[in-house]
Amino acid sequence: MKYLAAFSLLACAASALPSLETKLSVRKGTVGQAILDKALTAKGTPYAWGGGTCDGPSADNPPYQYGDVGYDCSGLVCWAVCQVTGRDLFTEGLRVTSTMYCADEAKLGYKKYPLEERQPGDAIFFGGECDCNTSGSIHHVGLMIDNGDRMWNAPNDDVNQVQENSISNFGEAACPYVIRFT
């Protein structure tokens, strides 16, 4: 009887704990937020074309060498991913916006979701046609701040700093999928 009571008590306690599935759902939701939170710390950092490493901002690269040290759009995203997850998208060949967006999910290691399902911390992409078969058609990436209209990004040399922008007023439509970091 004593063992039966102890077993019953353990069964009740175990049923009160969150399931593994619940824990994973919570964990998945926090990785993107943690990546966004890290990227937010770069507020005001200069834009540098080709700038960014796992260690932080770096000098701009040819053909645009203005002497700036900072991030470009994909450098900012890859730096934040590296800082939070330890994954180095720079050395995996996923640093460039189009290679990240066009990679299949197996190589990417993250899942793509329709734009309408965006969440904070998802990578959002821009590029006219968003055609993976056309060079240069995908040329900007940012991180969603919310599931609405706000993104965090390193827009370009004209703006010259990491900042918040509206996706609806960015100048071109967003690509049909976002990447969710989990």
Predicted regions and their residues:
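Catalytic cores and adjacent binding grooves of peptidoglycan-active enzymes
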Residues: 168
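N-terminal capping segments
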Residues: 17-87, 136-137
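Sequence contexts marking disulfide-bonded cysteines in secreted/extracellular proteins
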Residues: 53-55, 103, 131-133, 174-176
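...with weaker cross-activation on analogous glycine-rich loops/strands in unrelated enzymes
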Residues: 24-33, 86-165, 182
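Low-complexity, Gly/Ser/Thr/Pro-rich intrinsically disordered linker/tail segments
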Residues: 172-182
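Fungal secretory targeting signals
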Residues: 1-20
